[in-house]
Amino acid sequence: MMEQYYEIKKQYPDAFLFYRVGDFYELFEDDAVKGAQILELTLTHRSNKTKNPIPMAGVPHMAVDTYVNTLVEKGYKVALCEQLEDPKKAKGMVKRGIIQLVTPGTMMNEGPNDAKDSNYLTSVVTTKSGFGLAYSDLSTGEIYSTHLKSFAAVSNELLSLRTREVVYNGPLTEQSKDFMHKANITVSAPTPIEGEHAEISYVEQNLTNGAEKSATRQLVGYLLSTQKRSLAHLQIAKSYEVNQYLQMSHTVQNNLELVASAKTGKKMGSLFWVLDKTHTAMGGRLLKQWLARPLLNVDIINHREKMVQALLDGYFTRENTIDALKGVYDLERLTGRIAFGNVNARELLQLSRSLQAVPVILDALNQSDSDVLTDFAKKIDPLKGVAELISTTLVKDPPLLTTEGGLIRDGVDKQLDRYRDAMNNGKKWLVQMETDERQKTGIENLKVGFNKVFGYYIQVSNGNKSKVPLDRYTRKQTLTNAERYITPELKEHENLILEAQTRSTDLEYDLFVQLRDEVKKYIPALQKLGNQLAALDVYCGFATVAEQNNYCRPSFHTDSQDIDVVNGRHPVVEKVMTAGSYIPNDVKMDSATNIFLITGPNMSGKSTYMRQMALIAIMAQVGSFVPADSAALPIFDQIFTRIGAADDLISGQSTFMVEMSEANAALQYATKRSLVLFDEIGRGTATYDGMALAGAIVKYLHDKVGAKALFATHYHELTSLDETLDYLKNIHVGATEENGKLIFLHKILPGPADQSYGIHVAQLAGLPRAVLREATKLLKRLEAQGSELAPVSQQLDLFAQPEAASDEVDDNNSENSPMTDAEQEVLDDISNLYLADKTPLQIMQMVANWQKDLKDDK
């Protein structure tokens, strides 16, 4: 047996091999030692009498999914080695083989995962022009593909998808390996694709880009190789361009806490937490997808808004629809299990009950006065035949296992009914035999029983053994207080009953497989229905949230970038505050205002105001209503943020480097259609350095980018920029001082703040009084010194147009200052440099090389 084990293990050296032996899956050697530690199993040894006993640990086959999930959740792979023949009928060694390789990206059992989470496997291929990327959730069969120009873009997509595993076709650089490790992404090699596969041809039929085709073929090939079965539920790959949606980096999504709180990593405290009123797992997953990819297409946005408006206006339509949706199970994943062949009878009944809810939903929609709802209903196929087929074939409460009978209703199959009659008649005969034998022997407590080891038997207590007719009874088993016997007639009827039972069980399983295969024919229709119900679930949720929180329907204009939000609110902050206590604020930025320079004390609400604007924009572009009295918005193509102070552990960057990298991304790639949020730029370095950088960034945003930008700062000197920058406007968050106490007004007011109230905020934070007294003394001393210096309006000469100097070099006079080849090469290197793809250490090394080249050139 161990030779067979070692031969199979050679093929899967990087996976835990679960080797089936009887009712257990066994782990051996290093797998056993490591597995016992992780899974808290008892470590034993095989061949204890030898000098080198083999470490061994096992898990019951009935509970194997739990143990597999635990290992895969920790990033390991598990190869399931099954017995491929009945051990009782095997000649010699039982034939075994791998039936499935479970990996982080292919795990279908939810385990500890939230049912509203997707589990993506991603395939990446390198090409001459960049990268092809495709990803899939095996449990639902969905597949998407795109092509990207840089590994930085690939990295961002992987983080945004929260992918668990990447199939990569080439060697990774050390930097890429480090990224994958820190992002907790398992990297797997592609598997060779031999011959033609129907799944691959079907999936890639609509793809035209070569890189996307390669990535998709690699993805499906890996799935076929690891799952070792037909994957009929894989859907046609949908190609997308990242610029088809409102683009937000993974960092931006985290900063804005779209699906998880930045502090806890949990749902509570996120935008998803506020908006998720879905009642199905597939609706929850779809909502997450929408939040990650807000739309740019106004027509699609307007359609979603119309659906939400109709459900908001039609209270009874919405409530009846929601009540029916509560009875809908996860159609997408049930369909995946049907295709996968591991669906059980209870899950098929869940599918049937889900389908039985669809006519109720259609009735609710069709009774509405809204054309958009009735049109939506017309596109839904309720698949009544599938629901009826399942419900009339399976019993109401079938067992969990499909191999032990008790699945199929009476009357479904005539042969099955005959077997059942034989079993029932045999059992009636046993009851009658027990009565007859009591009378014949005079043993009142005589019993006829059954167990799997000895079959049917007659049990007599020790006190009545003397009455046993040994001429007819043969002793079978001795117990402490009784003896068990058999008779020729009992043995004959046992054979008849057990044969009927075995044949009945086998036939039931065959009938169940036939039912499953028949339902499998409807997989595309079931997937389409699942998508429709998921969308309807999200629409109902949006309508419910809008009603509960008094949201408004936003409008859009495509001919300008004007923003007009009246009494806007932060959707998350509002929910955690006492009802009615949130102070709303307007955001009004017309063609004469591109930048809001926001000042005010810490804790006053600057960051909340900025995030509020971004979240309103995102909510609007996914089709939700928004927290405001009214909102007229442009369609934003990108959102950039620099909010919060934290080191980037994944890329190994310091706080200041993160700050500069995020600022650079906005300065490089933002357009006039973008939204930029910068909070406290420059605080990670010396005061004057920070002030200089902040001022220069504001000026660049104003002069070169032209995006709508909200720029919060503590550098009050920057407020004089409105004298030279026409499209910049100063606003501040109001605060007042009463009886020595600072009171935040949380209201946005025009003009700059008159002071920062830093010491007051420190007092609110509970700093020691001695520290506060010393800070007050130092502040007065600095203010006294500052009064002797130039006024604030003159302190920003750094950002003013420099006066011409007599020794100034004329950059345009190339004849007087010709550029050397070395200088030109350095300039070209800098022009082509993509900073977001480099670490600080790499940049320092590049600068050192440039310095050396220029010195050598002299």
Swiss-Prot record:
Point out the signal peptide segment: none
The source's superkingdom equals: Bacteria
The Swiss-Prot or TrEMBL record annotates one GO molecular function as:
damaged DNA binding
Q: Does the keyword DNA repair apply?
A: yes
Which residue intervals make up region (Disordered)? Answer: 803-823
* Matching SMART domains: MUTSac (SM00534), MUTSd (SM00533)
Q: Which InterPro entries match?
A: DNA_mismatch_repair_MutS, DNA_mismatch_repair_MutS-lik_N, DNA_mismatch_repair_MutS/MSH, DNA_mismatch_repair_MutS_C, DNA_mismatch_repair_MutS_clamp, DNA_mismatch_repair_MutS_core, DNA_mismatch_repair_MutS_N, DNA_mismatch_repair_MutS_sf
Keyword DNA repair listed? The answer is: yes
Q: Which UniProt keywords apply?
A: ATP-binding, DNA damage, DNA repair, DNA-binding, Nucleotide-binding
UniProt family annotation: Belongs to the DNA mismatch repair MutS family.
| Function, in words | This protein is involved in the repair of mismatches in DNA. It is possible that it carries out the mismatch recognition step. This protein has a weak ATPase activity.
Q: What is this protein called?
A: DNA mismatch repair protein MutS
Source organism: Lactobacillus helveticus (strain DPC 4571)
Which gene carries the instructions for this protein? mutS
